[in-house]
Amino acid sequence: MLEIKSNETDLAARIIVVGVGGAGNNAVNRMVDEQIKGVEFIGVNTDKQALQLCKAPKQLQIGEKLTKGLGAGAKPEIGEKAAEESIEEITSALKGSDMVFVTCGMGGGTGTGAAPVVAKVAKEMGVLTVGVVTKPFRFEAKTRMNNALSGLERLKENVDTLIVIPNDKLLEIVDRRTTLPDALKKADEVLQQSVQGVTDLINTPSDINLDFADVQTVMRDKGIAHVGIGTGTGDDKAMDAVKAAVASPLLETTISGATDIILNITGDISLIEAQAVSYTHLRAHETGRNL
């Protein structure tokens, strides 16, 4: 059942963020709160009651016959079957899109099982498909981590690019007083920054023009990806920003060995600073194929 709350505006490139399962819905909620422009949001869940709390303008309850409006009970096979039951609705919701971000928390039932199905639908339609997902904390049940790893493998087969955020990395950047919800917001920021970065590149005029074709060249059929965001102030603002972006403490990947890079520079910097930033990126990944 697809519920549409509002109309969407036409975009140069139609970009959709699909939040699957509880964690995916929460990530979408935070992006809606941040008022990200140039993106459509869809919440997908088996749990009808949880889905009603999702702020996405479009909501898709999957597997109504299978789950009777309840959750997947932490069983990925139920999430997968629920998505397959609602395959026509998923296809309809993604029709006409140019790029789809699929986000979820790996390890549970709906996200782990349904996200690969949603991604497969998008990719088979020729849509540029990106997965942005979290891995469970090590202190969580072993079964949950095993489910997550299996789900990641299935998702990797059905996306062009995959960004993985291990929740354990959150422990390295927060202090002892940080609550779990506040820590998880940090993981959602990676999704938000990834989406915002791409939409800004495509839809915002800049000195060096990039369009959706350029984004596709870098992200199509590329596998595991590394995303980094950095900011800086003062005399060394440009280099401080690029060093922070390359470090990207929430990811277990590094920029070393990357075959292609999208570099977006925003701010009042000189040509020399821009050159230094680009050179630092090139040295970091040591290939220079596409920048």
Predicted regions and their residues:
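Tubulin/FtsZ superfamily GTPase core signature
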Residues: 1-289
